[in-house]
UniProtKB/Swiss-Prot annotation:
It catalyses: apo-[ACP] + CoA = holo-[ACP] + adenosine 3',5'-bisphosphate + H(+). This is Mitochondrial holo-[acyl-carrier-protein] synthase. GO terms for biological process: fatty acid biosynthetic process; holo-[acyl-carrier-protein] biosynthetic process. It comes from Saccharomyces cerevisiae (strain ATCC 204508 / S288c) (Baker's yeast). The gene is PPT2. Its EC number is 2.7.8.7. InterPro entries: 4-PPantetheinyl_Trfase_dom (IPR008278), 4-PPantetheinyl_Trfase_dom_sf (IPR037143), PPTase_2 (IPR016614).
Length: 173
């Protein structure tokens, strides 16, 4: 069964779109090079604000694989940023902004980017969010059914200097 066939008829609870300028992320990685101890320290502070620990671990592995700044690194970090931005927009379609934690908590603690074995990007809810962030347990209680009955369908595309991310928050199959 094709992807489209499996997903026809699923209710969409929210949609988000974000576009980023890749040279902006290339500049950040050049200015705060992960291959320089001083730069690495500053880059870690920056990435902790929007990358989940699982994404930072994956980024560390990419740094080892690449061993220098490459478009793959720029695209990874920009893709994570763009997915977080558009996931917030999708969540705001069905969750009151007043009920959501600050963007930094949502980005670095609640959601993380993964991919399937075939390389298709995915955005996952961290099931440990309520335990890691007790201050926001009420969010988990109020919206637990949303997080257990819905998932993000995501798409990333890049061409030259731009990367675009789209998220649809949909009912699970």
């Amino acid at each position: 069964m094709s992807f489209a066939s499996r997903n026809i008829g699923r209710k969409i609870a929210g949609v988000g779109v974000d576009i980023v300028y890749l040279p902006r992320f290339a500049h950040i990685l050049e200015k705060y090079s992960p291959f320089d101890p001083c730069g690495r320290s500053t880059l870690n502070k920056i990435t902790r604000k929007f990358m989940h620990e699982k994404e930072r671990f994956h980024f560390s592995n990419l740094l080892i694989e690449e061993n220098c700044l490459t478009p793959r690194l720029h695209e990874y970090i920009a893709g994570v940023w763009a997915l977080k931005e558009c996931s917030l927009k999708a969540l705001c379609c069905c969750v009151s902004k007043h009920d959501l934690p600050p963007a930094q908590v949502l980005y670095a603690g609640m959601l993380y980017k993964t991919q399937t074995d075939t390389g298709v990007p995915q955005l996952e809810f961290d099931k440990m969010f309520g335990k890691k962030y007790p201050k926001y347990q009420q969010l988990s209680k109020n919206y637990d059914s949303l997080f257990s009955t819905h998932e993000f369908l995501v798409s990333l595309s890049h061409d030259k200097d731009y990367l675009i991310a789209v998220t649809n928050l949909v009912e699970r199959e």
